[in-house]
């Protein structure tokens, strides 16, 4: 899956999602469809979720500080939504994947 590499104050951060981190933000109320209508709630959840997989030791204040330094926030948030959706799509799979188990209705 894709990720974002971000350097802040000479430290690299890798932002990405896993099913676990996507689940964490969903349980806290994240809905990607509401990023545009409730940005004050959804964007901090989305950004937090992107950091959790590889940087779970970061406190929310530090995550906010790093996010505040981002250039092109709109494109950045849209890319995070894309990364989140990639993770969600892994639950649906692809029927063409070799080695997938077949199922049938009985």
Question: Would you name each region that the model predicts?
Answer:
Residues 1-7, 22-23, 30-33, 37, ...:
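Charged interaction scaffolds used for protein-protein
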Residues 42-53, 78, 82-85:
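Short, hydrophobic/amphipathic alpha-helical patches that form generic packing surfaces
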Residues 13-15:
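Short, isolated positions in well-ordered beta-strands
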Residues 18:
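Residue-level signal for threonine
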């Amino acid at each position: 899956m894709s990720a974002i590499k971000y350097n802040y104050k000479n430290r690299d951060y890798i932002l990405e999602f896993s099913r676990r981190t996507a689940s964490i933000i969903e349980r806290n109320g994240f809905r990607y469809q509401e990023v545009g209508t409730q940005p004050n709630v959804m964007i901090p959840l989305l950004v937090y979720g992107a950091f959790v997989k590889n940087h779970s030791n970061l406190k929310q204040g530090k995550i906010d500080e790093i996010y505040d330094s981002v250039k092109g926030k709109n494109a950045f948030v849209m890319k995070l939504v894309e990364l989140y959706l990639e993770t969600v799509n892994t639950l649906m799979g692809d029927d063409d994947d070799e080695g997938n188990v077949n199922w049938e209705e009985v």
